[in-house]
C-alpha cells in the first residue's frame, strides 16, 4: 500500500470525500439536476474560498504542491458569476456564511501553520482537476452552456495535460518536506477542508 502523502490523503479522507459527493447541492449536480439559482449560489460561496487560498499560497509558495498560479480559480469564478448572474454579482449576491467560514479557516491556517495550506490545495485543486471535469460537463448540459461562457471554472488554460498535471500535483505533495507528525496534521487539515466543503454544499442545497 503506497504510504506517500498523496496516497494517505486519498485513503484517509475517502469517507468524507464520499459524503461530500452526496451533500446538498452536489448530490443534485452529480445526478444531472442543475438548478441555475443554486449553482450560482454555489459559485458565490466558493469565490471567497479561492480568493483566500490563492492569496495565502502566493504568500507561502513553499506550501503549494504545484504552481498555484496555473490552477488559480478565483478569476474564473468571477467570470462565471458575471456571465450567469451579471456584472453586479459581487454586490447583489449575498455571501454564503459557510463559504465565508471556509475562507476564514484558510486564513487562520496561513497565519498559524502555513504548511497546512497544502491540505486545502489538495482538496480544492485536485478535486477540480478530477471529478470537477465530469461535473463541468453535467453543469454545461444542465444549463445549456456551450464553450467557455459560464464554464471558465472548469477550464485550465495553463494546463496542457490534465492527467500529467494531477500526477505532478501528487508528486509535489509527496516531495513536501514534512515530518511524520506534520504529515498527520496535513491529513487532519484535509478532513477539516472536506467538512467545510460539505457545509458549503448543504448551505446551497436545491
PLM features per residue range, with description:
Residues 1-206:
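Metal- and O2-centered redox machinery and metal/ROS homeostasis
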Amino acid at each position: 500500500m503506497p504510504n506517500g502523502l498523496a496516497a494517505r490523503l486519498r485513503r484517509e479522507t475517502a469517507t468524507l470525500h464520499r459524503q461530500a459527493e452526496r451533500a446538498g447541492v452536489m448530490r443534485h449536480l452529480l445526478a444531472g439536476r442543475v438548478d441555475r439559482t443554486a449553482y450560482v449560489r454555489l459559485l458565490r460561496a466558493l469565490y471567497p474560498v479561492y480568493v483566500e487560498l490563492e492569496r495565502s499560497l502566493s504568500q507561502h509558495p513553499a506550501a503549494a504542491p504545484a504552481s498555484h498560479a496555473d490552477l488559480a480559480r478565483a478569476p474564473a469564478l468571477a467570470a462565471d458569476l458575471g456571465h450567469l448572474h451579471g456584472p453586479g454579482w459581487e454586490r447583489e449576491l449575498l455571501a454564503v456564511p459557510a463559504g465565508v467560514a471556509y475562507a476564514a479557516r484558510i486564513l487562520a491556517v496561513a497565519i498559524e501553520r502555513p504548511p497546512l495550506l497544502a491540505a486545502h490545495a489538495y482538496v480544492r485543486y485536485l478535486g477540480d482537476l478530477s471529478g470537477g471535469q465530469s461535473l463541468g460537463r453535467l453543469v454545461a448540459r444542465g444549463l445549456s452552456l456551450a464553450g467557455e461562457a459560464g464554464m471558465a471554472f472548469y477550464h485550465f488554460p495553463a494546463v496542457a495535460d490534465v492527467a500529467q498535471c494531477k500526477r505532478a500535483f501528487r508528486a509535489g505533495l509527496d516531495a513536501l518536506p514534512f515530518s511524520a507528525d506534520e504529515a498527520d496534521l496535513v491529513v487532519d487539515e484535509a478532513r477539516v477542508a472536506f467538512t467545510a466543503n460539505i457545509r458549503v454544499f448543504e448551505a446551497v442545497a436545491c
